């Protein structure tokens, strides 16, 4: 193969120049085979996975105002529960973490805690709804509940994908030869923070269905 490349080079080149060019080509091929491109590739996977996490949490937040208004029409006396959902949503949407700040453990923890608090508030709201048969049979509420259930499932999938992509990326820059490439070519690439499993089944979607 090398001999064939050597023959196909411009014949006007000197042997020395052709040799240097082939050396560069061989070195580039060698680097590629040694995973020199893994870090940027895995970094893009982390960013893509995080974008899905953000999208699904935003979709959930967008469903909540209509859900609250629908419940309020049937259960005005549950104002305290509804207020807790509204406040939890406001807090969750106020904390923003973009793909470029995923190396900030405090920021990601704040984001995750706020989202988990919102999950808890929604679960308590669904328990409250059990006391209102007319609300449980309302078509608008049933549609919102179905959308919310689907979104919670997609959130769980997005979180699992993000966790897996971060673990893959972090392993790459902590082990050889990835650590060597990080130290020499990708010094701006840092270890990414990940979600912490704070409870059993933490990555499972919370139930928003009636028992």
Task: For each feature predicted by the language model, list its residue ranges.
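A helix-centric hydrophobic-segment signal that preferentially recognizes long
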Residues: 2, 6-211
